[in-house]
Amino acid sequence: AFDLSAFLAEMEVLYQRGARNFKFVDRTFNLKIAASLSILQFFLDRLTDGLFLHFEVVPDHLPDRLKALIAQFPPGVLQFEVGVQSFNVEVQQRISRRQDNAKTEVNLRWLLTQSNAHVHADLIFGLPGETLESFAAGFDRLYQLRPHEIQLGLLKRLRGAPIARHTADCGMVYDKIPPY
């Protein structure tokens, strides 16, 4: 956790020094709605040419209050990296990912049709239990939504990460050299 007012004060310092490109890499940005709204409002109040904001978001969590603020930004300011990862329910369960796929699609459609945000959606291949066929079906499902970009990422294992419990039963093989 962090002190939001102290954080915004530091953002103000950066903004006053001329920073206009901000990339937030908290993958749960939109789960803390009060903080999300404050951060977005901070930048909405300071709209200027060249302002660019990148946020990573959970795909199935876009409450109406957040949508209302997102819709106020003009084109070219917001970019959302939407971490879909997989549409395969069995894979989602295996990696302890709770994602409402129908809500994910609704939110992606909303971002693409009701906001001016640039939408970059992620899928990961190599997840435990994901087959070529299920990955292809997920890709097709995402492609039909027409995000501005689709990023296909290769699963990387971090030492000590819980995903290692699937290594043997899923026949997963990793490089011995980081990033594994």
Question: At which residue positions do the language-model features occur?
Answer:
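N-terminal pre-triad scaffold of radical SAM enzymes
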Residues: A1, K23, K156-L158
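Conserved SAM/AdoMet-binding glycine-rich loop
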Residues: D3-A121, F125-L127
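Short, structured secondary-structure boundary patches
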Residues: T28, F43-L47, F139-L145, M172-Y174
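Flexible glycine/acidic-rich beta-alpha junction loops that bind and position SAM and/or redox cofactors
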Residues: I33-A34, V84, V89-I95, F125-E133, ...
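Short secondary-structure boundary/capping segments
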Residues: S38-F42, I70, S96-D100, S134-F139, ...
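Catalytic cores of alpha/beta
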Residues: R65-I70, P128-R146
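A broadly tuned preference for mixed-charge, low-complexity surface segments
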Residues: Q72-E81, W110, F135-R141, C170-P178
